[in-house]
């Protein structure tokens, strides 16, 4: 039985990370990462692969692994494998679909997620390890790259990795929520309603990705799923 092509073109419900069509890009550099790629939309670009920050992903991976023990890595890989279709469905290409093999795709999500969370943790801990704090300009560009719509991983992946981290080291009530870590590094100011929430309430907030988090803060409806609306517009940088 043939399906109507209009139904085949429908976006899956998980879709939230888009490749911006060239015809509406007035300046390509506004949509293109400068230091590193996150996710499949800019994966493998020669000009990014040669950047030092791409090489730092391996270093971040090793540093993150040194924080944890147990079976967290196997659990996270299994989580990515189990949710691979859902993760792939979050990305929308101008034409076609992601052609990366499952092995390459899963490895990319693994390293990119750990890279992001290690950056958030390093910033929280105030460490000067060569990844952050070398210059104001570099930190600004890192934040800028992490906020680009085309340069995202789904937030639920970072959330799962964060849960494995705090479960492994056993400091749930002492360690900041992922929302707090993210807002602190990205310079997104949380309204008083959010600051007064418990970590468990933070965990209930639905975020699609960092661009969505920034958008929600700017329009004053974070968290929209809890029916809270703030009249205050928030500063990001």
What are these regions (language model features)?
Residues 1-237:
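Acidic, Ser/Thr- and Pro/Gly-rich low-complexity regulatory segments
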